């Protein structure tokens, strides 16, 4: 399962350890049946048959609906992937669920309701918060790319926009070009 979250932050890149801003969209792609599950606030009608959209009234409903889906044994993944999920998506999501819904709900990220916080240092000795989710392996594409994509040569940046251009010849969606994700979640099908 691939996961990506969008956060309502106009103040730059949000810090996952504080999880100060609301989660406004969660997208998961089930790699077995190729179905995209998207939770968002606001009206949206998918234009593809393999997209299921869950319209939520507010962030609490969005998080609860996502957790109910994720924790269901038929949906709970063995492996979760994504870009920078180890140091952003997963910690932000767990911290935000804890802040909005409490510790017990955050534990629903694990099929055994057991998550463990870890603090790890990056190559610059900065401390980063991450979580081990019992029962689910995490494969972060950004980390894998840094370790194994040497055929692309040394990169000036490992941000998604740069790496998408290097590998695919395309840039990440621009907020300026497509509008704000705070107003509309209709971008989700385009970015999937």
Feature annotation, model-predicted:
Residues 1-79:
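Conserved RNase H-like, two-metal-ion catalytic cores of nucleic-acid enzymes
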Residues 23-33, 79-184:
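Metal-dependent phosphoesterase core characteristic of DEDDh/y 3'-5' exonuclease domains
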Residues 47, 72, 102, 174, ...:
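Serine/threonine-rich low-complexity intrinsically disordered regions
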Residues 48-53, 178-191:
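Inter-lobe coupling/hinge region of RecA-like P-loop helicase motors
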């Amino acid at each position: 399962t691939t996961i990506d979250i969008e956060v309502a932050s106009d103040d730059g890149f949000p810090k996952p350890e504080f999880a100060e801003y609301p989660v406004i969209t969660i997208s998961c792609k089930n790699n077995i049946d190729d179905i995209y599950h998207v939770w968002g606030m606001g009206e949206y009608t998918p234009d593809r048959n393999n997209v299921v959209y869950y319209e939520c009234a507010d962030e609490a409903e969005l998080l609860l609906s996502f957790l109910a889906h994720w924790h269901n044994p038929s949906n709970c993944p063995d492996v979760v992937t994504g870009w920078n999920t180890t140091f952003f998506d997963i910690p932000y999501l767990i911290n935000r669920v804890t802040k909005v819904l409490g510790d017990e709900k955050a534990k629903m990220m694990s099929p055994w309701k057991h998550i463990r916080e870890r603090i790890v240092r990056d190559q610059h000795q900065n401390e980063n918060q991450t979580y081990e989710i019992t029962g689910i392996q995490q494969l972060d594409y950004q980390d894998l790319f840094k370790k194994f994509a040497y055929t692309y040569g040394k990169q000036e940046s490992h941000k998604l926009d740069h790496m998408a251009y290097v590998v695919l010849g395309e840039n990440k969606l621009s907020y300026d070009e497509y509008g704000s994700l705070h107003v509309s979640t209709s971008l989700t099908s385009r970015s999937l």
